[in-house]
Amino acid sequence: DLSLLVLDVTRGLEVQDFRIITEIRKAGKGLIILLNKWDILPNKTEKSFDHIVKDILEREPLLEYVPILSISAKEGQRLHRVIQEIRTVYENCHRVIGRERLAEVFSNLMQQNPHPSRQSRAVVLKRACQVMVEPPVISIETRTPELVDESYKRFLMKRFFEEFQLMGAPLRLNFDQKLILRKDEDLEQFTLSSNSV
């Protein structure tokens, strides 16, 4: 259900690491990034971790919602935190948000920050419904899915991650002309492995 990506912090994040991250996200798996060999990082200061995380997020902003931990597998450093994060991310990947809560958050977002018009056409996002868990998928109804702006999609993702505490989960947004409404209690049967969406 989830992947632990172990990186050699002494080498930094490489192009192949980003390819692996992309594949993990495509597969709909939760993700935790482990910066290994922290014990032998040269020139380490109190701010080293923050600088490394900042560099990672500048290269891939969506990793803001992925736990990143510094560890030493050799020394057993912070491995208890890894276990805690595994539990949290697993729960987040299987979270049922709740129709009423999602409707409330979505309505507030649309009132405060509606989608801007594009190509002289209004882009109206009508309603949202969670249609799947493992990974969590939120479907949003609109007559013009092709006009939904990429930056607005990122805005919605950011707000949903924050509002619904989905750290590490591979949240997906679908924009559809017709919404399939599902009951919260039925969501467990709709997973990527069941090919139900």
Question: What residues fall within each predicted segment?
Answer:
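Conserved acidic residues
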Residues: 1
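C-terminal-of-GTPase-core extension/linker across diverse P-loop GTPases
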Residues: 5, 11-197
